[in-house]
Amino acid sequence: MKTGNQFNTVALVGRSNTPGIAEPLATLADSIATLGFEVVFEGDTAREIGIAGYPALTPAEIGARADVAIVLGGDGTMLGIGRQLAPYRTPLIGINHGRLGFITDIAASDMQALVPVMLAGKFEREERSLLEARIVRDGEPIYHALAFNDVVVNRSGFSGMVELRASVDGRYMYNQRSDGLIVATPTGSTAYALSSAGPILHPQLAGIVLVPIAPHALSNRPIVLPDDSKIAIQIVGGRDVNVNFDMQSFTSLELNDTIEVRRSKHTVPFLHPIGYSYYTTLRKKLHWNEHASNEDDKAS
């Protein structure tokens, strides 16, 4: 296990069904092993790329055995393995092999230079919060899930508006007619919530944001809540209503079902290269107006 900031066992996780990912993963594995680290692979990744010579483990086995997981893929890959490793507090290093790369912040072209430095203990660490949600039907919980980005209650593409009753900490907030409601973490505030005109929350802000999706009343605006809030969303009206967790798992809902959402007790450690800036990520990914001559403020 760890000695200070040092790691012994490194797990590699790759984006599934991705052409061209086998070679960089194999190269990365060999280079890490050459440095003296034990390298293991997530089982599905190992099978898909057909790599041999390294143990293939389940996410639970990775959580129990690995000191750090390196994820080569897109944000969706990072979200998926992050939820599975959250109970084990396994730190994640994200290498972008997808499109956007908000949370996989290392370019694939930089991984051979940056990963050895980070494995030697030179990195910046931050904790990312998750949500836990459960569906209650007739007074009994019927489904439970974690979400890294968001919990989204919405209508299907062929039905009309839904009516939702929202309360926070047992206090009634409103009834809302809309296409749905997003409950997002700070990490998820730059995902679906942002496209629905929600605010950007810094990842270290202790908050949860509620963002209506195409509300009938324009006065239904996003609201940021303390991250210890307990949110309940009841299905009052509408047909074909679903709830999604990070857009990677979903279940159908019935009238009077209640979705209860709160901050999870788990957090996921993200490791970044020295000098990482969240604001640089925002500028690059959201294409904010910037001038090449601008730099971070100099320390006075």
Curated annotation (Swiss-Prot):
Is the keyword Transferase in the record? yes
Main location as per UniProt: cytoplasm
InterPro entries per the UniProt record, alphabetical: ATP-NAD_kinase_N, ATP-NAD_kinase_PpnK-typ_C, NAD/diacylglycerol_kinase_sf, NADK
Residue runs in coiled coils:
none
* GO cellular component labels: cytoplasm
Please give the PANTHER family that the UniProt record associates with this protein: NAD KINASE (PTHR20275:SF0)
**EC id:** 2.7.1.23
Which Gene Ontology terms describe the biological processes this protein takes part in?
Answer: NAD metabolic process; NADP biosynthetic process
Active site located where? D75
This protein's source sits in the domain of life called: Bacteria
The record's comment on protein family reads: Belongs to the NAD kinase family.
Where it sits in the cell: the answer is: Cytoplasm
- Residues annotated for NAD(+) binding in this entry: D75, G76, N149, D150, R177, D179, T190, A191, Y192, A193, L194, S195, A214, Q248
Q: What Pfam families does UniProt report for this protein, alphabetically?
A: NAD_kinase, NAD_kinase_C
Substrates-to-products reaction catalysed = NAD(+) + ATP = ADP + NADP(+) + H(+)
| Descriptive protein name | NAD kinase
The protein's required cofactors? a divalent metal cation
Per UniProt, which keywords does this protein have?
ATP-binding, Cytoplasm, Kinase, NAD, NADP, Nucleotide-binding, Transferase
Specify the enzyme's EC class, one word: transferase
Report the gene name: nadK
GO molecular function terms listed in the Swiss-Prot or TrEMBL record: ATP binding; metal ion binding; NAD binding; NAD+ kinase activity
Q: What is the purpose of this protein?
A: Involved in the regulation of the intracellular balance of NAD and NADP, and is a key enzyme in the biosynthesis of NADP. Catalyzes specifically the phosphorylation on 2'-hydroxyl of the adenosine moiety of NAD to yield NADP.
